[in-house]
Design a protein with these regions (language model features):
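Short, hydrophobic beta-strand segments
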Residues: 153-160, 252-272
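Low-complexity, acidic Ser/Thr/Pro/Gly-rich terminal tails and inter-domain linkers that flank the onset
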Residues: 185-203
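Beta-strand-rich structural segments
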Residues: 119-123, 168-169, 205-223
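Extended substrate-binding grooves/exosites of carbohydrate-active enzymes
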Residues: 1-176
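Edge beta-strands of extracellular beta-sandwich domains
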Residues: 174-186
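Short, solvent-exposed loop/linker segments at the N-terminal edge
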Residues: 109-114, 199-208
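Extracellular Ig-like/FN3 beta-sandwich strand-entry sites
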Residues: 160-164, 205-207, 262
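Short aromatic-acidic-glycine turn motif
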Residues: 140-142, 188-193, 231-248
């Protein structure tokens, strides 16, 4: 959501919320506050997050007069078991052993050309440099000037132009150690299926979760394509359900069809 501003209980005409993780429910706070408490006070023993996984019910801040909102929006992972942007913020702080380098938002914004579109980076590395179409927008390093600056790298004044966003991360010694690229999507070309498992036990119970993406000819996610996708299964397995993570979507999970949400959804298959 633009402009990117700290807000409590913000509501929008599309009944969605911002992925920049600067908006919270009236009773909540940004994750950075909890991170700082844990880092600054030896007496803390952990963090309580409400909630790790979206669920049906309690669609705050759309609690009243907000049909068709019917599921929570503040989870780290959405109702389709897909990680949200904030998942990578938590991961960058909680998991110091694994590399995290995540760019948000996506970079397919037809009609926003020339408009301010901030870029956030969630990473376990202390510093990163941002490039848009080959032009450097400088390095940012985590610092103590604000809560968000302690845990995020933020370029607040960048303007949208179609093309490529690249981030190069640097370790504490100033060595370039990782990079990530996000590109503007072209026209939708095909459907990409990625299963979390290659084999199932033939017990009639085992499940596979298949991430479904609408992508362009180069494999870039098409985040504005929300077409309906129909499912059928050949062989001894069977289709069980699908979800797209949209808190306003009323399609039934068990039917073999579902609209994508931001170009994605999850389908569940069961062994025969």
């Amino acid at each position: 959501k633009f402009p990117v501003e700290d807000k409590k209980g913000a509501k929008y005409e599309d009944h969605q919320c911002s992925s920049y993780d600067v908006e919270v429910c009236p009773w909540s706070n940004i994750p950075d506050e909890d991170f700082a408490l844990a880092d600054d006070h030896h007496w803390t023993i952990g963090q309580f997050v409400w909630t790790g996984f979206d669920y049906l019910g309690e669609p705050s801040p759309y609690d009243t007069d907000s049909w068709p909102n019917h599921s929570s929006m503040f989870g780290i992972i959405d109702l389709a078991s897909l990680p949200k942007d904030r998942y990578y913020l938590y991961r960058s702080v909680w998991n110091k052993e694994a590399e995290t380098l995540h760019i948000l938002p996506h970079w397919t914004w037809p009609g926003r050309e020339g408009e301010v579109t901030p870029i956030f980076v969630y990473t376990n590395y202390p510093t990163a440099e941002l490039f848009i179409n080959g032009k450097s927008y400088g390095k940012q390093s985590k610092n103590n000037s604000s809560l968000k600056n302690r845990y995020r790298l933020m370029w607040m004044d960048t303007k949208y132009e179609p093309g490529e966003v690249k981030v190069v991360a640097y370790d504490k010694n100033g060595k370039a150690v990782a990079e990530k690229v996000v590109r503007t999507a072209g026209k939708p070309h095909h459907i990409e299926l990625v299963s979390n498992r290659n084999e199932l036990t033939a017990d009639g119970k085992d499940l596979a979760y298949v991430t479904v993406k609408v992508v362009d000819k180069d494999g870039n996610l098409c985040p504005t394509d929300n077409r309906q996708i129909n499912f059928s299964v050949k062989g001894t397995g069977k289709y069980r359900a699908a979800a797209n993570g949209d808190p306003t979507n009323l399609e039934q999970f068990h039917l073999p069809k579902m609209h994508a949400f931001n170009g994605m959804l999850t389908a569940i298959l069961q062994a025969g």
